[in-house]
Regions:
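An N-terminal domain-cap segment
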Residues: 6-61, 71-73
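Structural motif
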Residues: 59, 109, 135, 141, ...
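Short, structured beta-strand-loop surface elements
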Residues: 66-87, 94-156
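Short, surface-exposed beta-edge/turn micro-motifs
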Residues: 33-36, 107-110, 180-182
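A generic structural motif
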Residues: 60-64, 183-184
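Short helix-to-loop capping/linker segments positioned immediately adjacent to catalytic or ligand/cofactor-binding
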Residues: 37-40, 124-125, 142-145, 166-173
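A structural signal for short, well-ordered beta-strand segments
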Residues: 53, 140-142, 187
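C-terminal edge-of-domain segments
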Residues: 1-10, 147-250
Length: 250
């Protein structure tokens, strides 16, 4: 497995011992979740948007509406009084998102983060309190996908969070595809940090205080599926959904 290339943006400067430079660590963080935070500049204003993602060996794929400013870099339409115009849900969804080149030029470099909190580190002193975590940060100029490449990325996105669902559910229609934007962001420039273990004050002067210290773990677990109340009687979840109940997400 290759190493991550260090750049001015991804070089570990603080807490270097927590930094990981192997690409396997990046994939580990990305596999463990399906929600990322996409940071963009829109109209000179920073925006951080939560969205679903998927990935392959080379790219991170993020999903959203074709009318979303965060996924197109377009300025919002304005009414005569200067406020953002509400053009109606259907009109926004059918609005064109611009070409691949236009989207890349409008958005410039973006930053995507994925973070998993594994526990609270409760130390003897408040100063030493902390968090056990796994975190990845990806920089890149997004590329808007079209055609078969877009459909392939949608499958990757769907299968990442819900394995088996792409083949089980109805495939997207042309109108649905037109209303959806998929961006590809290269994984070439990425940074990973991980922190685990107990507090750092177990051998210092605070150890004599007689206070409890340790880690309060956190885990995200899939619960039993909740059926749509409009389902026909007797229709049960398919195996690829039901089998996940009681399992950990990450």
């Amino acid at each position: 497995m290759s190493e991550l290339s260090a750049t001015e943006r991804t070089r570990h400067r603080r807490l270097r011992e927590k930094g990981r430079t192997d690409r396997a660590a990046l994939y580990e963080v990305l596999r463990a979740g399906f929600i990322c935070h996409l940071g963009v500049i829109s109209g000179g204003v920073p925006m951080v948007v939560p969205t679903v993602y998927g990935f392959d060996a080379d790219n991170l794929y993020v999903h959203g509406s074709a009318a979303s400013r965060s996924l197109t870099g377009r300025e919002p339409s304005r009414s005569r009084n200067g406020s953002e115009a509400d053009t109606g849900t259907d009109a926004r969804q059918d609005a064109p998102g611009g070409s691949e080149a236009e989207t890349s030029a409008a958005m410039g470099t973006v930053c995507v983060t994925v973070t998993h909190v594994d526990g609270l580190v409760l130390a003897r002193s408040v100063f030493e309190h902390g968090v056990n975590y796994r975190s990845a940060m990806v920089y890149g100029v997004p590329r808007k996908l079209e055609g078969e490449e877009k459909l392939t990325a949608l499958r990757i996105l769907t299968e990442h969070s819900a394995p088996g669902q792409w083949d089980y559910a109805r495939q997207p229609s042309r109108k649905e595809l037109a209303a959806t934007t998929i961006l590809a962001i290269s994984l070439a420039e990425a940074s990973v940090k991980m922190s685990s273990g107990p507090p750092d004050d177990g051998e210092g002067p605070d150890a004599a205080l007689g206070l409890w210290a340790g880690v309060l773990p956190i885990a995200t677990t899939w619960l039993a599926p909740i059926p749509d109340p409009l389902l026909p009687e007797g229709l049960t979840p398919p195996d690829h959904i039901g089998v996940r109940a009681g399992t950990r997400l990450s």
